[in-house]
Amino acid sequence: MGLPAMKLQYDGPLTIATAGSRKSVSWKNQDVSWGELAARLATPLKTAETQDEYNTMRKAQKDEIKDVGGFVGGALRNGRRKAESIIHRSLVTLDIDSVPQGEDPWEVVTLVIGCAAILYSTHSHSPKAPRLRLVIPLSRKVTPDEYAALSRRIAGDIGIDMCDDTTYEAHRLMYWPSHSIDGEYRFEIQDGLWLDVD
């Protein structure tokens, strides 16, 4: 992935699909290590606008700025990011967009889940309005149906009301991390056993 892998005790191979834009019609399946993905997620792209400028933009403008490419946490058939194209998932990825005042989702994740996990902030994130992504590696590849059930279960464990309703779709993409020139970036990692799906 272009960066040295993060050194982790619990590392291993997984498959993701990547593309340079959400609009891409050709996604590439890649075998990477958990440590390589962690290193990529720990290294956000800094964009030219300020946080205040970003916050006043229309949704279409925001969508263009935060589209720095992304990944799907599994393999796709024929390079297409559609529901029917998912072969399997290697990762659970959740959108945590509705965090109650004073709550820290990372504290909940480390207490309740207890497995390997990464939490990183989105382009729209701010300390007063946290918008975060949770990434959890799985002990084995899962089918799209298994993924939907598993991701809902994890969301239920950490607080389903914090998670976006569309986050359980197996073909859902996660943008690579980015932030405004003066924006905050948050990255947390827990080095542990991968989530046992059985």
What kind of feature is each model-predicted range?
Residues 99, 181, 192-194:
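Short, glycine-/Ser/Thr-/acidic-enriched flexible segments
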Residues 94, 186, 193-195:
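Metal-dependent nucleotidyl/phosphoryl-transfer cores and adjacent nucleic-acid-binding surfaces
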Residues 126-127, 140-142, 163-189:
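Short, conserved secondary-structure transition motifs
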